[in-house]
């Protein structure tokens, strides 16, 4: 919704300050290099394109033009160099792994079985798995079934984790379209794997675009805090009203995918 609002002019941005892990002296930006690498800058792309003025704030200023460009110099008005744009340890080191919690593994197995027996796990499937331990574990069970049957996914869409990018590297996923990254393995994949593509938040889920990527999804597996018997989903609070989560691509995936499976939010 936000990307749509920016592009239609409903949300006007006077100045966009964009954290740039790497920026050359001409204003080209990427998020896959530098000490503060964060991966895809998909959610900053609409801001850079439509803001009246764009300021790149970087702790990785380089003198030569960047080979990998997420946001081009034509959209950047000013560059500000600072000592640090943030703490990269806030991004999971390595890759988010399959859960070892027995209860979560049971739920993950059920999720994978639902996907299988609903007839969704077929050659050319397009899927999205969230960053929670259960979602990643479900992806692991799905991969096991893919190994058994020889099924290959046409594409993965949405936030990228190390586990999903390993599936990409090993040929279980044909290509990946990525508006954000969850761990350092995913960041490395985006930089080095030519089948791993950075996309904007608008390309991912703008309902006003001709065909947002979420509309291609066969199935999405995401985290939730509560789900009632009528399939209404809460991703913000626990049963006592305490904020413990946030909606990411949940509404978008729910609108676009053929089927959505929600798991409980990882602590």
What are these regions, as identified by a protein language model?
Residues 1, 34-43, 106-111, 202-205, ...:
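Active-site glycine-rich loop that binds ribose-phosphate moieties when present
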Residues 1-23, 153, 160-226:
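Ligand-binding beta-strand-loop-alpha-helix segment within the catalytic cores
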Residues 2-10, 19-20, 40-47, 65-70, ...:
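A generic local secondary-structure boundary/capping motif
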Residues 36-41, 61-81:
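His/Asp/Glu-rich metal-coordinating catalytic cores
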Residues 99-190:
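N-terminal active-site beta-alpha-beta segment that forms phosphate/nucleotide-binding
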Residues 263-267:
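Conserved small/polar residues in nucleotide/adenosyl-binding loops
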């Amino acid at each position: 919704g936000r990307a749509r609002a920016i592009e239609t002019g409903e949300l006007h941005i006077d100045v966009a300050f964009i954290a740039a892990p790497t920026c050359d002296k001409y204003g080209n930006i990427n998020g896959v290099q530098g000490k503060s690498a964060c991966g895809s800058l998909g959610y900053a792309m609409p801001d850079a394109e439509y803001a009246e003025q764009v300021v790149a704030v970087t702790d990785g200023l380089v003198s030569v033009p960047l080979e990998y460009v997420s946001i081009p110099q034509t959209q950047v008005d000013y560059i500000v160099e600072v000592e640090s744009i943030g703490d990269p340890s806030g991004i999971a080191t390595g890759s988010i792994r399959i859960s070892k919690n027995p209860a979560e593994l049971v739920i993950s197995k059920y999720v994978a079985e639902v996907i299988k027996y609903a007839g969704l796990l077929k050659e050319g499937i397009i899927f999205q798995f969230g960053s929670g331990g259960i979602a990643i574990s479900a992806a692991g069970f799905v991969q096991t079934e893919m190994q058994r049957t020889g099924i290959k996914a046409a594409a993965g869409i949405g936030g990228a984790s190390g586990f999903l990018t390993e599936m990409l590297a090993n040929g279980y996923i044909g290509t990946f379209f990525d508006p954000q990254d969850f761990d350092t393995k995913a960041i490395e994949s985006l930089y080095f794997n030519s089948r791993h593509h950075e996309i904007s938040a608008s390309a991912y889920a703008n309902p006003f675009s001709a065909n947002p990527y979420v509309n291609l999804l066969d199935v999405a597996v995401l985290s939730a805090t509560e789900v009632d018997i009528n399939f209404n989903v809460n991703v913000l609070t626990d049963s006592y009203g305490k904020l413990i989560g946030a909606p990411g691509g949940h509404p978008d995936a729910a609108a676009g995918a053929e089927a959505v499976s929600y798991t409980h939010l990882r602590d």
